[in-house]
């Protein structure tokens, strides 16, 4: 069960990165997960509360919270 949960989390992160590249809305949702997309995230920081934090730190963990929202 734990292994599946870990794999599921990784898939969500990858999916969020793909969405962020395909549509601008995806950047706001999972912007924290993609350090490279941090610049775009800053423009739409208002859409996501923890987005600005994720952009500065560039941590993958923040991306999980963003995708959940």
From Swiss-Prot:
GO BP, one annotated term: defense response to bacterium
Oxazole-4-carboxylic acid (Gly-Ser) crosslink location in chain: 39-40, 61-62, 64-65
Top-level taxon of origin: Bacteria
Swiss-Prot/TrEMBL keywords: Antibiotic, Antimicrobial, Bacteriocin, DNA replication inhibitor, Plasmid, Thioether bond
Keyword Zinc-finger: no
Cross-link (Thiazole-4-carboxylic acid (Gly-Cys)): 47-48, 50-51, 54-55
Covalent cross-link (Thiazole-4-carboxylic acid (Ser-Cys)), residues: 40-41
Maturation and modification: The processed N-terminus does not resemble a typical secretion signal sequence. Maturation of thiazole and oxazole containing antibiotics involves the enzymatic condensation of a Cys, Ser or Thr with the alpha-carbonyl of the preceding amino acid to form a thioether or ether bond, then dehydration to form a double bond with the alpha-amino nitrogen. Thiazoline or oxazoline rings are dehydrogenated to form thiazole or oxazole rings.
Intrachain S-S bonds: none
Cross-link for Oxazole-4-carboxylic acid (Cys-Ser), residue positions: 55-56
Propeptide section residues: 1-26
Function of the molecule: This glycine-rich peptide antibiotic inhibits DNA replication in many enteric bacteria, that leads to induction of the SOS repair system, massive DNA degradation and cell death. B17 inhibits type II topoisomerase by trapping an enzyme - DNA cleavable complex.
Official protein name in the record: Bacteriocin microcin B17
UniProt organism field: Escherichia coli
């Amino acid at each position: 069960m734990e292994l599946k949960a870990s794999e599921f989390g990784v898939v969500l992160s990858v999916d969020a990165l793909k969405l962020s590249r395909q549509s601008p809305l995806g950047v706001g949702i999972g912007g924290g997960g993609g350090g490279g997309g941090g610049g775009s995230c800053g423009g739409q920081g208002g859409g996501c509360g923890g987005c600005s934090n994720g952009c500065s730190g560039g941590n993958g963990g923040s991306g999980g919270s963003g995708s959940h929202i």
